[in-house]
Amino acid sequence: MDYIVSPTSSEPYEFYRDRTFRGGANGNQTNMDTSPEDITDSDEQNDTTTTTSEMSSTSSVPSIGENKVSKNNKSAGISKISDSKLIFDSDNKDQDDEDDEDDEELEGLDTEGGFVLSNSDITTSDLYNLQMRIFRSETETDDDTDSETTENVRRALNNINSRKNIFDTEDRKILNMNSTEKWTRKTIKKNNKYH
């Protein structure tokens, strides 16, 4: 059994190292034999275990609280973690504290449809005001009023939404007049479908 000092804990923890056995079919005989290397390894391990236990007892960490065990916990074998064993501040937090922090982060944010929208997202009113400014700058006249600008924006948006391709109705009329497709188009029959 070996001991290792953890960087996050003041006490060492134990682990078992599997030793590799030398030999073949006679495994029992090789287990009984110990080499001089194994003996010196075990002596060094005993020295390290004593030093780690001394270091843990003479550590410079002040003990704030003691390991207090209540009567109910003694019977169950559960001991309370003392404050001296807490290495990081985050070890002392409860689950309720973490939930409160999450709620505080979400308080200032707008939620729409279950999604959290940050303050930098563009809302529909901002988009409408931007479009209104664009159309107002294009048709800048003294007679222009807000209601006319609103109508211009509404009309332009309706045109954009009603288009199914990039051409408007006037462009389609011109293309139909100049196109030769309707004069060269033939009726499709079963016989000449693939010709």
Swiss-Prot record:
Residues 35-46, 94-110 have a biased composition (Acidic residues). Residues 47-63 have a biased composition (Low complexity). Residues 1-11 have a biased composition (Polar residues). Residues 82-93 have a biased composition (Basic and acidic residues). Residues 1-118 are annotated as: Disordered. It comes from the Viruses. This is Uncharacterized protein L324. It comes from Acanthamoeba polyphaga mimivirus (APMV).
